[in-house]
Regions:
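Short alpha-helical elements
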Residues: 1-200
Length: 200
């Protein structure tokens, strides 16, 4: 269902239903003690799980992969791309990511899969917040997803259940977009279509 709605939303925005470019990132969230497997993210100082997501240039979810928070971004990216092989994305060949994904193991894997990783970095000498084209899109998607309570803290016993919660949130966002409902902070992908800096 997520794939069908994303393709419909892209067509509604005048885009090809299959994106040529994706943006990926990960986010760590706390997991309840009653939940399943967890891990410790030293960078975020958080015990929980990590959500690795890939979105298109409109910020619409393509695929999600949930791991223990201790899994590195590069390892999570490989798992995400392996998961994506189950989906029909014939045009997707380039993926943007931040410097955390600048790892040899990831470059070797994507080369074998005919993908290209584009590392986004801040302009030299830049200070303060600098939105990076396409990279900002995936960070905004995380903001939309966090508007849904079940994505703020993980209470699920399995990774698959955690992924299902993300897909449910994504489906809700795209249904609102397609039915032209009033956009709220957790559903307003439409503004991206009007921003030429984020168009692809």
């Amino acid at each position: 269902m997520n794939d069908a709605l994303r393709e419909a939303a892209r067509e509604q925005a005048g885009r090809d239903p299959h994106p040529p470019l994706g943006a990926r990132d990960s986010g760590t969230m706390k997991a309840a003690a009653t939940g399943g497997e967890r891990g410790y993210d030293g960078g975020k100082r958080t015990t929980g799980r990590k959500k690795h997501i890939l979105v298109d240039t409109l910020g619409l979810l393509v695929v999600v992969f949930v791991t223990a928070a201790s899994v590195s971004d590069a390892a999570g990216a490989i798992g995400l791309l392996k998961r994506m092989s189950r989906f029909d994305q014939p045009r997707l060949r380039a993926i943007t990511a931040d410097s955390a994904y600048h790892r040899e193991i990831l470059y070797e894997y994507v080369a074998r899969q005919w993908y290209e990783i584009q590392i986004s970095s801040r302009p030299e000498g830049a200070t303060g917040f600098v939105p990076l084209r396409h990279r900002w899109v995936v960070e905004r998607t995380f903001g939309w997803l966090m508007q849904h309570r079940r994505n703020v803290k993980d209470y699920e016993r399995t990774y698959e259940s955690s992924e299902s919660q993300v897909y449910i949130s994504s489906v809700r966002l795209m249904l609102r977009r397609l039915t032209n409902m009033r956009m709220t902070p957790d559903s307003g992908a439409a503004s991206n279509a009007q921003n030429p800096r984020l168009a692809a």
